[in-house]
C-alpha cells in the first residue's frame, strides 16, 4: 500500500524540490499582491481626482442675478445694441475667474462663442465691469457682483430686435455651465434700457 523510500538521497531531493516550488509560489503571490496594491492605489487616486473635478463642475457655478439691454434707435428701428448680465457666485462656489470663462451665444441669426477681452466687447469678445467687489473679472465673495457686457449689435445683424430671444450659456474655468434665455420685449419704443 505505501512504498518506502530507503535511499536518503532521493528523499532529500524530493524535499528540496517541494521547498523550491513552495518558495516560487510565495514569490509569485507576493508579486501579484504588490501589483494589486499598486493598481488599487492608482485607481483610488484617479477616482478621487475625478470626484473632485465632478464636484467642482457642480458647485463652482455662477448665478445670473439680472439681465438688461441698452436700446438704440438707428434708421427708425429700435434694437438692443448691448446685452448685459449681472452675475454672482453660486452658493458654496470657489473663486470664479470670468476672464477664463466663455459665453456661447445662440441668437436669431448667429451662433458663436465669446471669449474674454478686458478692454472692449465686440463680435468675438465680452468684457466685464465690477458692480460690487474689488475685482472686475473675478468673483471672490458671495456678495460680489460683476456685469458681463456683450455687444449684440456686433454679434448679430444690427442688434436684437423686439420679440427676439438669445440663449446664453456661460461656462466657467471649472467646466460648469449656466444657461440664460434673454428675451427682448415686444416693444422697445421710447425706452433706453429693457429687462431681458
From Swiss-Prot:
Keywords: Archaeal flagellum, Glycoprotein. Residues 1-12 form a propeptide. Glycosylated. GO terms for molecular function: structural molecule activity. GO terms for cellular component: archaeal-type flagellum. It is found in: Archaeal flagellum. One of its GO terms (biological process) is archaeal or bacterial-type flagellum-dependent cell motility. Its main location: other. Belongs to the archaeal flagellin family. Flagellin is the subunit protein which polymerizes to form the filaments of archaeal flagella. PANTHER family: FLAGELLIN B1 (PTHR35903:SF1). This is Flagellin A1. It comes from Halobacterium salinarum (strain ATCC 700922 / JCM 11081 / NRC-1).
Amino acid at each position: 500500500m505505501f512504498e518506502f523510500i530507503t535511499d536518503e538521497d532521493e528523499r532529500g531531493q524530493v524535499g528540496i524540490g517541494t521547498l523550491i516550488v513552495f518558495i516560487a509560489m510565495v514569490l509569485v503571490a507576493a508579486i501579484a499582491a504588490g501589483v494589486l496594491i499598486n493598481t488599487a492605489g492608482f485607481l483610488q487616486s484617479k477616482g478621487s481626482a475625478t470626484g473632485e473635478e465632478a464636484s467642482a463642475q457642480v458647485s463652482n457655478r455662477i448665478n445670473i442675478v439680472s439681465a438688461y439691454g441698452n436700446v438704440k434707435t438707428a434708421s427708425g428701428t429700435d434694437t438692443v445694441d448691448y446685452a448685459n448680465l449681472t452675475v454672482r457666485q453660486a452658493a458654496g462656489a470657489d473663486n470664479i475667474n470670468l476672464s477664463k470663462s466663455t459665453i456661447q451665444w445662440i441668437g436669431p441669426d448667429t451662433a458663436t462663442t465669446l471669449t474674454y477681452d478686458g478692454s472692449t466687447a465686440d463680435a468675438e469678445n465680452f468684457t466685464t465691469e465690477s458692480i460690487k467687489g474689488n475685482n472686475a473679472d473675478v468673483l471672490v465673495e458671495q456678495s460680489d457682483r460683476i456685469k458681463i457686457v456683450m455687444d449684440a449689435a456686433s454679434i448679430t445683424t444690427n442688434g436684437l430686435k423686439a420679440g427676439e430671444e438669445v440663449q446664453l450659456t456661460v461656462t466657467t474655468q471649472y467646466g460648469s455651465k449656466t444657461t440664460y434665455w434673454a428675451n427682448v420685449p415686444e416693444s422697445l419704443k421710447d425706452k433706453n434700457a429693457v429687462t431681458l
